[in-house]
Amino acid sequence: MAARVLGQMVLAVLMASAVAGVAIAAIARVEWPAYNTSNQLHALTTVGQFGCLAGLFAAGLLWRRGRRTLARLGALAFISAFSVVTLAMPLGATKLYLFGVSVDQQFRTEYLTRLTDTAGLHDMTYIGLPPFYPAGWFWLGGRIAAATGTPAWEMFKPWSIVSITIAVALALVLWAAMIRFEYALVATAASTAAMLAYASTEPYAAIITVLMPPVFVLAWAGLRARTRGGGWAAIVGVGIFLGVAALFYTLLLVYAAFTLTIMALCVAVARRHIDPLLRLAVIAVISGAIALLTWAPYLLAAMRGEPADSGTAQHYLPDAGAELHFPMFSLTLHGALCMLGTVWLVVRARTSTRAGALAVAVVAVYAWSLLSMLTTLAGTTLLSFRLQPTLTVLLTTAGAFGFIEATLAIAHRYRPETSRRVVAAATAVGAIGAVTFSQDIPDVLRPDINVAYTDTDGTGQRADRRPPGAERYYREIDAKILEVTGVPRNQTVVLTADYSFLSFYPYYGFQGLTSHYANPLAQFDKRAAAIEGWATLGSADDFVAALDELPWEPPTVFLMRHGANDTYTLRLASDVYPNQPNVRRYHVELDSAVFDDPRFEVSDHGPFVLAIRKPGGKPETDGH
């Protein structure tokens, strides 16, 4: 059984990759109008979604008629195509992914750029440091970009879509291994649609999110196995999943571990036996071993006692993190489905493995949210608002099962002929509901899609064909840096507040976007204090001396903006949690006189001023 499922998972990965790759390439060959100026892409997305949902329905009919191999292949193809058309078609006229290269996507693109430039595990920004944020998704995408010769910023979109599509196909395989094939189709389609609508902006989170419902069901079955020898394949599989989660997204790993701990404790208490806790320990060992693939370098550096800050990654409390989220009370079609799922969980939690697992997972989200609010007393949070997409996917999946069971319960009250009509009517309602929700996904994502068209990409162009931003000067800035320094990009440290420059080119940065994204080993606050101190200097000698005395590799390139009174400015950020917004922006003004020296070459590029410290004063540093 386990070997067969593993083989099906390999096939799913290959099919999803092929479907996504071919579809993305085909869409890219056409000259489309921009999504934010035309409805054509939305219209074609709707047509594609309708075709994919019809294909899934046909796969279910083939299964009932005994054409099971063809049904499995068709289902994998159509669920993959559904994921691709929903994301790739609205983005068909841009090279950027959802939310472009703005805010969070800025540092994600920077991370992918770093791991495209090198196969080694390096921090996205700081030279000589191991990565603090999980590198798994970025490393895989970086290797693909390097192998194909594609710029990392341009690979971000196709890799996001392909990896999400692979996860969707794997979810179908897992569901089909545990429940009836037709039910697996419904559950996967529902959870996929919810994930695409509410989690796809963060692709590596979306991957883990769509796989959580079947994995939690698998875990619940494994932890509740009645015999000592039973359920171990499930335990090993869950351990591998948690290990992959550790490589992709720390928060979802911790939430999943929290949920599994609740499950194990519930079973151990109910049966008055320690076996579920031992199985949980096995899961922890397996996942921990896998996690070390990317976490080991950072942990070793921390154990060596290298200077580090406490980190501020959890210093964020938006409105969504200060209240509990109840999607079942939304007055929408999706809200009604979540309400149906909630009712199903309450009614069936004690009698259904699926309902029991999903109920514990939902309760765990709310428990995590309350704990997050309490941890504000300790000066931090648990970022519970980031679990809202997870909660939505869990309730949507439960709603799909609730719809199926409600339909069957009603049908069983009537004679066979009437019963078939009830099922047919419910199928029609479900299909219409699926199309209705699916065609609204681009509208849910519209703000993120629009940014993908209005941001300036790595070629210096905007996809909506309007005048590009200041980023259009990045190419000539990059050429100037290479000309003056004479070393590869990964041997140069750049100080800039225009962080998207580091998203497009693999230079190291002297300071990160904010402390929330910064490696704790980088000592963000001390670097900020050093930069602020340079504002008091008035001569090149003092400035060069200050650079050479830094405990870190000093910047040799300064990408700044013109300020008033012969100054060059940098716009930096400081953490002001628990205030909201949690970041305070401020300007540091450097006297232009500190760069007025033969040791620096200064040039203007549009709104930018570029100051480069000429080689000769410092030994070369190998960024790898």
From Swiss-Prot:
GO terms for biological process: capsule polysaccharide biosynthetic process; cell wall macromolecule biosynthetic process; cell wall organization. Disruption phenotype: Allelic exchange at the chromosomal MSMEG_6386 locus of M.smegmatis can only be achieved in the presence of a rescue plasmid carrying a functional copy of MSMEG_6386 or Rv3792, strongly suggesting that this gene is essential. It is found in: Cell membrane. It is an enzyme of class 2 (transferase). It catalyses: Adds an alpha-D-arabinofuranosyl group from trans,octacis-decaprenylphospho-beta-D-arabinofuranose at the 5-O-position of the eighth, tenth and twelfth galactofuranose unit of the galactofuranan chain of [beta-D-galactofuranosyl-(1->5)-beta-D-galactofuranosyl-(1->6)]14-beta-D-galactofuranosyl-(1->5)-beta-D-galactofuranosyl-(1->4)-alpha-L-rhamnopyranosyl-(1->3)-N-acetyl-alpha-D-glucosaminyl-diphospho-trans,octacis-decaprenol. GO terms for cellular component: plasma membrane. The keyword Transmembrane applies. It is a multi-pass membrane protein. The keyword Transmembrane applies. It holds the Pfam family AftA_C. GO terms for molecular function: glycosyltransferase activity; transferase activity. Keywords: Cell membrane, Membrane, Transferase, Transmembrane, Transmembrane helix. InterPro entries: ArabinofuranosylTrfase_AftA_C, ArabinofuranosylTrfase_AftA_N. The chain crosses the membrane at residues 5-25, 43-63, 73-93, 127-147, 159-179, 181-201, 203-223, 234-254, 280-300, 326-346, 355-375, 391-411, 422-442. Pathway: Cell wall biogenesis; cell wall polysaccharide biosynthesis. Its EC number is 2.4.2.46. Belongs to the glycosyltransferase 85 family. Involved in the biosynthesis of the arabinogalactan (AG) region of the mycolylarabinogalactan-peptidoglycan (mAGP) complex, an essential component of the mycobacterial cell wall. It is not able to add an Araf residue to a terminal Galf. This is Galactan 5-O-arabinofuranosyltransferase.
